Amino acid sequence: KTSTRTRCAFEVAARDQGAGVTYLEPSASQIGHKESIKDTARVLGRMYDGIEYRGFAQETVEELAKYAGVPVFNGLTNEFHPTQMLADALTMREHSGKPLNQTAFAYIGDARYNMANSLLVLGAKLGMDVRIGAPKTLWPSENIVARARAVAEETGGKILLTENTKEAVKGADFIHTDVWVSMGEPKEVWQERIDLLKDYRVTPELMAVSGNSKVKFMHCLPAFHNRETKVGEWIYETFGLNGVEVTEEVFESPASIVFDQA
């Protein structure tokens, strides 16, 4: 998959440590096209000391890790976004004012994909109070939830899945969301998602429901919060929404810590 923040973060970090970096563009690589993942892994593992992979299938990054013989970092798959979790955990620790195992956060929106899955597992591992607010059809898979609950039993974490946004955000220290349509999905799914999620936007009113004057807003970016992008303008012209998963008022408010997070 294409990347802005994840690629830049890896490249800057590597160069800060004196490492060289090679970027293989999705359209310019033969990975999975003319050459299998297994063969690619064994070639790159002989040339490089580490590999960061950002793509679609979780199985692909796991196969790379199995055969490369060097550390492989998951820069994002459809299922998980672990390096973003490092940034999210650090950001919450910086802004919480209390230990993470005494911190509550809510994720609002489409919870089937990498961000909600990863936040669920992250929160469970850190013993946090995790709430997912989403239509039941857009909840994480039963397998992911079961894994998170098993971890939470050991760490003292709490996990709540609910269709009620007010229940999800009540008492929360942080409110997360993400885009409603992911990379690679066709435009045709927008209408369906908007119909399902129109009551799951992060608005000033929803932030206030937390009852926490210090509640913070988080988003891994990019966000559709206004009409200042081609997609944002298309959404406005097609569906009449100025801002989708989050309003401009919340995104640009003092409660927003998205750029610290990014």
From Swiss-Prot:
Its EC number is 2.1.3.3. The record marks E94 as: Important for structural integrity. The keyword Cytoplasm applies. InterPro entries: Asp/Orn_carbamoyltranf_P-bd (IPR006132), Asp/Orn_carbamoylTrfase (IPR006130), Asp/Orn_carbamoylTrfase_sf (IPR036901), Asp_carbamoyltransf_Asp/Orn-bd (IPR006131), Orn/put_carbamltrans (IPR002292). Disulfide bonds: none annotated. Carbamoyl phosphate binds at residues 3-7, 30, 54, 81-84, 219-222, 247. GO terms for cellular component: cytoplasm. SUPFAM superfamilies: Aspartate/ornithine carbamoyltransferase. Its main location: cytoplasm. GO terms for molecular function: amino acid binding; ornithine carbamoyltransferase activity. L-ornithine binds at N114, D178, S182, M183. Changing V209A: In strain: Vedros M601, LCDC 81-176 and NCTC 10294. It is found in: Cytoplasm. One of its GO terms (biological process) is L-arginine biosynthetic process. Keywords: Amino-acid biosynthesis, Arginine biosynthesis, Cytoplasm, Transferase. This is Ornithine carbamoyltransferase. It comes from Neisseria cinerea.
